[in-house]
Amino acid sequence: MVDQPLRSFYMYDAVGVYQTQADLQKYPVMQNSKVGDVRYRDANGDGVINDSDRTLMGKPDPDYTFGITNTFKYKNFDLSFLITAQTGGQIYSVLGRAMDRPGMGANGNVLSHWKNMWKSEAEPGDGKTPGIDNANTGQFYDSRWLYSTDFIKLKNVTLGYRIPFKKKLIQNARVYLTGENLLMWDKYEGGFSPEANNGGSTGDYDYGSYPQARVITLGVNVTF
């Protein structure tokens, strides 16, 4: 799209569920829509839901990235940390869609949010979760699996202690304990981490990628 970020997400915007037969008359519908299907936003306002109603829903690149680092020293001790953060980007959970779209059926294990699904007009659910056997809209890429990649992360913490030596054989020694990728605060529910993706350098979709490993390192530096 002209004047839009590269690799932008262009898809249907899911705004609810057709909960009753009256909803099919009240709201714009897609061909073969039925009660219990996902309801999409009529982006162009023509009263019909079709390919022309796909719209720009986000982009993988964050608007801002942040970082803060510092080192504290007290006598022979030192403590350093690195905190990183970002805001304004999105990621598409392909794994979530593969496992969780309508039409997959209710005969196997399903995610917990299906407890609130549409079952009938008498049991319409939460108004956001369609019928699990309603396959009409399950084939489409839509905003239900598009997530924010905003996060704050404790990337690195190192605690060190310098051992004093009076003899000249060893000039200096420092013992340290380092933790990497210790904590992350985010709202991503489509996978393990908003940093994990299968898009390579593009970072636009996640198909169950592993998060960055948490690493604990104990080491010693010695100067002779």
Regions found by a protein language model. Name each.
Residues 1-22, 106, 113-124, 139, ...:
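C-terminal beta-signal and terminal closure region of outer-membrane beta-barrel proteins
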Residues 81, 175-177, 220:
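Membrane-embedded beta-strand positions of outer-membrane beta-barrel proteins
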Residues 43-51, 130-143, 195-202:
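Flexible, solvent-exposed coil segments and beta strand-coil junctions
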Residues 76-81, 166-167:
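Repeated loop/turn-to-beta-strand initiation elements of outer-membrane beta-barrel proteins
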Residues 73, 84-86, 178-182, 223:
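Outer-membrane beta-barrel pore domains and translocons
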Residues 62-66, 150-155, 171, 212-216:
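Residues that define the transmembrane beta-barrel architecture of outer-membrane proteins
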Residues 1-59, 180-182, 187:
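Conserved small-residue
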Residues 1-11, 21-22, 31-35, 86-174, ...:
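Extracytoplasmic gating/loop element in the C-terminal half of outer-membrane beta-barrel translocons
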